């Protein structure tokens, strides 16, 4: 069945619900005391996992649209990417405010030096910031071919973010490994999609 614009509208509504309902759950859990004895860590991990899930969902759109021959699915990619950035920002704020404290926000630079996994996290966030700021059609027209080159940096985030998660956890948990494996599979799938273009590009110089 070929998807219509109406289907895409419903998909976007579903994305909004999937991205906002967890935030509502988190707020309720905080107010009702549903978190553990270390709520700051719970909030940091929850927001980080949500950002990572949305990143993986964003990366899944292109291969899914290609293999299912549903090009309209690509219209959902920007919304997923923006929600990924939003949750990534919440993750950064939760660390800066709950872990360091507003009065010690100046220590963030020191923390980045002494904790390399934080450096990977902030690099990932900065890339997502650049992608969010240039996600409009106006930016795409203005930047031309440079727009696609910039937005290919999302694959750098797909490498750094799972490493950041794996490196940051202090207890052995399967979830960081699962997310890393999923990111690796999506990157491999993307590589297969790009390989024919790469081979064609090489032939031009023979």
UniProtKB/Swiss-Prot annotation:
Q: What are the required cofactors? A: FMN; heme b
Q: Which GO terms describe its cellular component?
A: plasma membrane
**Does the record's keyword annotation contain Cell membrane?**
yes
Q: Where are the transmembrane segments?
A: 13-33, 79-99, 116-136, 147-167, 169-189
Q: Any note on cofactor binding?
A: Binds 1 FMN per subunit. Binds 1 heme b (iron(II)-protoporphyrin IX) group per subunit.
Looking at the record's lineage, which domain of life comes first? Bacteria
Tell me the InterPro entries matching this sequence.
Fe3_Rdtase_TM_dom (IPR013130), MsrQ-like (IPR022837)
Per the UniProt entry, what is one GO biological process?
protein repair
**Any coiled-coil ranges, and where?**
none
**What's the chief localization of this chain?**
membrane
Q: What does this protein do?
A: Part of the MsrPQ system that repairs oxidized periplasmic proteins containing methionine sulfoxide residues (Met-O), using respiratory chain electrons. Thus protects these proteins from oxidative-stress damage caused by reactive species of oxygen and chlorine generated by the host defense mechanisms. MsrPQ is essential for the maintenance of envelope integrity under bleach stress, rescuing a wide series of structurally unrelated periplasmic proteins from methionine oxidation.
This protein's assembly is summarised as: Heterodimer of a catalytic subunit (MsrP) and a heme-binding subunit (MsrQ).
Q: What is this protein identified as?
A: Protein-methionine-sulfoxide reductase heme-binding subunit MsrQ
Species whose genome carries this gene: Yersinia pestis
């Amino acid at each position: 069945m070929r998807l219509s614009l109406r289907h895409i509208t419903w998909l976007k509504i579903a994305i909004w619900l999937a991205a906002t309902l967890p935030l509502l759950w988190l707020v309720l859990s905080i107010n009702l005391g549903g978190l553990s004895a270390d709520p700051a860590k719970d909030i940091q991990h929850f927001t980080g996992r949500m950002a990572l899930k949305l990143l993986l969902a964003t990366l899944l759109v292109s291969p899914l649209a290609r293999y299912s021959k549903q090009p309209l699915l690509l219209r959902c990619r920007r919304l997923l990417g923006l929600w990924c950035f939003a949750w990534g920002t919440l993750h950064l704020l939760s660390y800066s405010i709950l872990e360091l404290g507003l009065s010690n926000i100046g220590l963030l630079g020191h923390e980045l030096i002494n904790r390399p996994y934080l450096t990977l996290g902030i690099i990932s966030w900065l890339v997502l910031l650049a992608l969010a700021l240039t996600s409009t059609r106006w930016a795409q027209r203005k930047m031309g071919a440079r727009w696609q080159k910039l937005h290919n940096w999302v694959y750098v985030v797909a490498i750094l973010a799972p490493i950041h998660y794996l490196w940051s956890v202090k207890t052995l948990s399967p979830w960081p490994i699962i997310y890393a494996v999923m990111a690796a599979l999506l990157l491999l799938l993307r590589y297969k999609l790009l390989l024919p273009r790469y081979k064609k590009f090489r032939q031009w110089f023979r």
